[in-house]
């Protein structure tokens, strides 16, 4: 493994126990990257778990609502930080946005997630989020 990967991304992949419709909670309703979503959204995707997540160095934007999935599955690895699905962080002088969403093609056609991605790209280059 490339040791700097965790520093860059903020964690490691740790299985994908759910492939279903889930509820995603917005981590910070004041953050312009995701505020337009409201408190939660429902999507259908394959949900990846993250291990060794750097909670202190990351700002979680989206997280899985655990009430929307079966937590008794053998591949589920509960962590004290829950199931973050999108976050921002810094790496050196750079800005990093990561999302564990996007396995299913339909996610890329979802206007809400397209807007999150545009906002994240704008944030990464130091520009404000879309204002609509």
Residue spans for each PLM region:
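Exposed alpha-helical structural elements
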Residues: 1-4, 32, 112
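A basic- and aromatic-enriched beta-loop-alpha substructure that forms the phosphate/nucleotide-
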Residues: 1-14
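Catalytic beta-strand/loop cores that center a nucleophilic Ser/Cys/Thr
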Residues: 11-92
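Extracellular ligand-binding/catalytic regions of CAZymes and related secreted enzymes
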Residues: 68-132
């Amino acid at each position: 493994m490339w040791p700097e990967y965790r520093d860059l991304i903020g964690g490691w992949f740790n299985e994908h126990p759910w492939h279903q419709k889930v509820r995603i909670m917005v981590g910070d309703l004041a953050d312009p990257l995701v505020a337009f979503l409201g408190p939660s959204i429902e999507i259908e995707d394959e949900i990846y778990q993250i291990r060794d997540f750097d909670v202190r160095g990351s700002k979680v934007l989206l997280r899985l609502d655990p009430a929307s999935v079966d937590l008794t599955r053998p591949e589920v690895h509960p962590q004290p930080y829950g199931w973050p699905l999108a976050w921002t962080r810094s790496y050196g002088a750079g800005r990093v946005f990561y999302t564990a969403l996007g396995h299913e093609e339909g996610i890329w056609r979802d206007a809400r997630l397209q807007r999150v991605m545009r906002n994240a790209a704008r944030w990464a280059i130091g520009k404000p989020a879309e204002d609509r």
